[in-house]
């Protein structure tokens, strides 16, 4: 198993301690601990939450012959925020069946997630090099993109863009792309009735709680809550914010360091954007300067996936 390290474990441990001190935990930390990674892998298989997206990827995989022709039989696949890599492998399996050679570069901040993605691809005899990097960093994105020569197939799936500032993130991704590259990217479509309810799903709560448990904060120590906000920079941008509120005085243990939390204090947790379809298209075309070649709405209407070029 080959993994190139841009974001070291020492760096992320220091950043995590600083984030706890600041009472704000960004996305990358939620997959860092092995327990969190295991809970995410289980959550990604939840048919109620991600079954529709899996059906979308089966549709994308059915179009593998067209991608194979575009890439002339050799496809470097660079997956930003790859997670456990299951959707990537579904497409790469279809590309291999068309006679394509796939070179796989999963990119993630989590060592545990990278190991899952790399091991899964190795089992399918796909040449793989994992890249441990922070995909919110434009410098790290460019480094990862340069792992292969154009044309390349970039992937950002599972509403990964929505876990960052999407206006900035799509620009960073577009800056990595050349004219013959392709990008498969999705966004979660906001729904008044279901978007918040999905966050309150027991499986989703279990995943979020895994990070807190990894630093010694248990279910009886406080409560996880959700807020919905609107991003006024453009119509149709909905921001769903998670937080933990301590119900008693307690402490979190990070790399042997005790960080106290007083009763009533809140820790901001990873946020997620959801969009109207028009807002998602606006992000890709107006903010990213990308051309949408094809759209794939998921059967459950939760996700909209787009195939793009620069």
Please annotate each region the language model reported.
Residues 1-79, 85-131, 148-149, 300-304:
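Rossmann-like AdoMet
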Residues 132-139:
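Conserved SAM/SAH-binding loop
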Residues 155-156:
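A conserved beta-strand element that flanks and buttresses the S-adenosyl-L-methionine
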Residues 162-175:
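A short, conserved alpha-helix within the catalytic core of class I
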Residues 177-193:
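Conserved beta-strand signature within the Rossmann-like core of class I S-adenosyl-L-methionine
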Residues 203-289:
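Substrate-binding/catalytic lobe of Class I Rossmann-like enzymes that use SAM or dcSAM, i.e.
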Residues 237-240, 301-307:
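Short hydrophobic/aromatic beta-strand or adjacent loop that forms the aromatic wall/cage
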Residues 290-300:
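Conserved S-adenosyl-L-methionine
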């Amino acid at each position: 198993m080959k993994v190139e390290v841009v974001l070291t474990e020492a760096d992320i441990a220091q950043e995590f301690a600083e984030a706890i001190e600041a009472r704000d935990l960004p996305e990358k930390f939620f997959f860092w601990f092995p327990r969190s990674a295991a809970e995410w892998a289980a959550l990604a298989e939840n048919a109620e939450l991600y079954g529709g997206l899996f059906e979308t990827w089966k549709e994308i995989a059915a179009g593998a012959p067209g991608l194979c022709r575009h890439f002339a039989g050799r496809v470097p696949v660079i997956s930003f925020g790859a997670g456990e890599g299951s959707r990537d492998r579904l497409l790469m399996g279809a590309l291999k069946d068309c006679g394509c050679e796939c070179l796989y570069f999963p990119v993630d901040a989590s060592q545990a997630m990278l190991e899952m993605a790399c091991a899964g691809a190795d089992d399918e005899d796909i040449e793989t090099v994992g890249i441990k990097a922070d995909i919110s960093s434009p410098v790290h994105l460019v480094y990862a993109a340069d792992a292969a020569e154009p044309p390349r197939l970039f992937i950002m799936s599972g509403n990964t863009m929505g876990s960052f500032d999407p206006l900035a993130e799509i620009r960073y991704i577009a800056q990595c792309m050349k004219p013959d590259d392709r990008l498969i990217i999705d966004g979660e479509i906001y729904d008044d009735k279901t978007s918040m309810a999905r966050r309150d799903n027991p499986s989703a709560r279990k995943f979020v709680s895994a990070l807190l448990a990894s630093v010694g904060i248990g279910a009886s120590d406080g409560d996880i809550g959700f807020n919905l906000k609107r991003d006024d920079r453009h119509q149709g941008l909905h921001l769903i914010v998670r937080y933990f509120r301590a119900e008693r005085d307690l402490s979190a243990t990070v790399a042997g360091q005790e960080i106290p939390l007083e009763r009533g204090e809140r820790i901001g947790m990873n946020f997620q954007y959801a969009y109207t379809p028009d807002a998602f298209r606006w992000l890709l075309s107006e903010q990213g300067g990308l051309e949408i070649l094809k759209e794939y709405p998921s059967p459950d209407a939760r996700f909209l996936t787009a195939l793009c070029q620069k």
